[in-house]
Design a protein with these regions (language model features):
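Cleavable N-terminal export/targeting peptides
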Residues: 1-26
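Transmembrane beta-strand segments of Gram-negative outer membrane beta-barrel proteins
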Residues: 24-39
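Outer-membrane beta-barrel "beta-signal"
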Residues: 30, 234-245
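Residues on the lipid-exposed face of transmembrane beta-strands in outer-membrane beta-barrel proteins
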Residues: 33-37, 70-76, 130-134, 148-152, ...
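Extracellular/periplasm-exposed beta-strand and loop segments of Gram-negative cell-envelope proteins
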Residues: 40-67, 94-127, 153-186, 214-239
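Repeated loop/turn-to-beta-strand initiation elements of outer-membrane beta-barrel proteins
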Residues: 81-86, 140-142, 197-205
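Helix-adjacent hinge/juxtasegments
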Residues: 119-124, 135-141
Length: 245
């Protein structure tokens, strides 16, 4: 989270310094800093335990977690010189860690107590996208637009498996946990819409929504007894962003 906040501050600072340079030449090139809330959705969560001949499969459903996001884009506006209401940009966008936790199994015994197995997924999604925008230009200072994007998503996946036991009186008697992490490099695509407000001929504010599909994340690991575990999830994000160009 601290890295994302720091990047957001640098992105906004870079916008104004680069904007001053670009305005003098009216080249059509622009720089945009973006920040906002990302609702990261972990859909169709799956967990598998492989204990030799015994295999157990669990479903965790869908889970949303709202995190902070920020990014920086460098683009070109074709309207400046070609009178075509299209923009194309390269954008990096980072998001904070989104958490999801669900229970795999619970058991009870009147003699020895009981136990519960839980798993947790923590995902961080960074994207590098090529975005194309179509601007619905008009005579006002407000310009609605729609967008599509294609690119690369790097998903950092941390998984925790926890086995908790309690005695017949209900007190926790033992907790064991496995922690593993890994990365997935995926194809990503997005669609979006928004509106831009021209504060001055050289400065614009932007409010937008984007749906991002970042592919699937899969993490496999073993414990000391060579028992196998696998956590899988489909990764999506709903980005609500404020931008300064």
């Amino acid at each position: 989270m601290k890295k994302v906040i720091a990047f957001s501050a640098l992105a906004m600072a870079g916008v104004f310094s680069a904007q001053a340079l670009a305005d003098r030449g009216k080249t059509g090139f622009y720089v945009t800093g973006k920040a906002g809330a990302s609702v990261v959705t972990q859909t169709d969560q799956r967990f598998r335990q492989d204990f030799g001949d015994d295999v157990y499969k669990y479903k965790g459903g869908d889970k949303n977690d709202t995190v902070f996001g920020a990014g920086l884009a460098v683009g070109y506006d074709f309207y400046q010189h070609y009178n075509v209401p299209v923009r194309t940009e390269v954008e990096f966008y980072g998001r904070g860690a989104a958490d999801s936790r669900y229970t795999l199994d619970t058991w009870h015994s009147p003699i020895v107590g009981g136990g519960r197995e839980d798993t947790q997924n923590r995902l961080s999604v960074n994207t590098l996208m090529v975005n194309t925008y179509y601007d619905f230009r008009n005579s006002s200072a407000f310009t609605p637009w729609v967008s599509v994007g294609l690119g690369y998503a790097r998903v950092h996946h941390k998984a925790t498996y926890t086995d908790t036991s309690w005695n017949e009186s209900g007190k926790v008697s033992d907790i064991s946990a496995l922690h593993y992490s890994g990365y997935d490099n995926n194809f990503a695509w997005s669609i979006g819409a928004g509106v831009r407000y021209d504060v001055t001929p050289d400065i614009a504010l932007d409010l937008s929504y984007r749906y991002l599909d970042a592919g699937k994340s899969s993490l496999s690991y073993k414990d000391a007894e060579e028992d196998k575990y696998k956590s899988e999830v489909d990764v999506k994000s709903h980005d609500i962003m404020f931008g300064v160009t």
